[in-house]
Amino acid sequence: MDAAAGKASLIKVVDPAPRQIPAPDAVQRALNLLKTAKRPLIVLGKGAAYAQADADIRALVEKTGIPYLPMSMAKGLLPDTHELSAAAARSYVLPEADVVMLIGARLNWLLSHGKGKTWGGKDHKAWGGQKFIQIDISPQEADSNVRIDAPVVGDIGSCVSAMLGGISAMGAGWPKPSADWLGAITERKDRNVAKMGETLARNPSPMNFHSALNVMRDIVKTNPDAILVNEGAN
């Protein structure tokens, strides 16, 4: 078969990723739980990045005022410099949060399966007491490791859009996180950033990986359009 015939034989997919709309009662259950939170947290995962629903996810974060923690594959979805980013306070927010909304993030080994000391549990198998909202396209992910109190199954874009609709319907009645919670996160972020700054400022010989990170940080600051490539081989 020549190239022209091969190209002509290809079948065009009309709708490669049809929307999967979440059940309205599941969305309402998630919103009801989120409203009760005293120390809410949003965790953004790889699925959130793949969904290409950046604008809606940002709107959800900013409308609710809930701090967010990006997983490594969700970096860049929202900036780490955003005032609601808890990226520099990960070890503080995970065990302290009382309601955690997972958006395209799964409770696998990267999140210690939702339990253990990472989440404030007494030992590596103990549940920390958090309540989870999980937005995911796969129903099999709900309750795979710990209880998911409010699973919302559907594509990320449709689920986040539905959540936004429910929040907007409440208008000014949506409760924002307390100043104490946000202030505690900011204090921990500032402390960790200052501590890392001291480490990066050292210039040992031979150089270590912190030295390289310091140089790269300076390059990015002066060249914000620079593209960094991380080669992931072990």
PLM-predicted stretches and their roles:
Residues 22-23, 29, 33-100, 215, ...:
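Anionic-ligand anchoring segments at beta-strand to alpha-helix junctions in alpha/beta enzyme folds, i.e.
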Residues 19-23, 27, 46, 50-57, ...:
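Generic structural signal for well-ordered, non-membrane alpha-helical segments
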Residues 1, 70-185:
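Glycine-rich, acidic loop regions that bind phosphate or pyrophosphate groups
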Residues 1-33:
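Conformationally flexible catalytic loops at phosphate/diphosphate-handling active centers
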Residues 1-6, 175, 225-228:
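Proline-centered turn/helix-capping motifs that create local helix->coil transitions or kinks
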Residues 13-17, 40-46, 74-81, 102-104, ...:
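Short, basic, glycine/proline-bearing loop/turn elements
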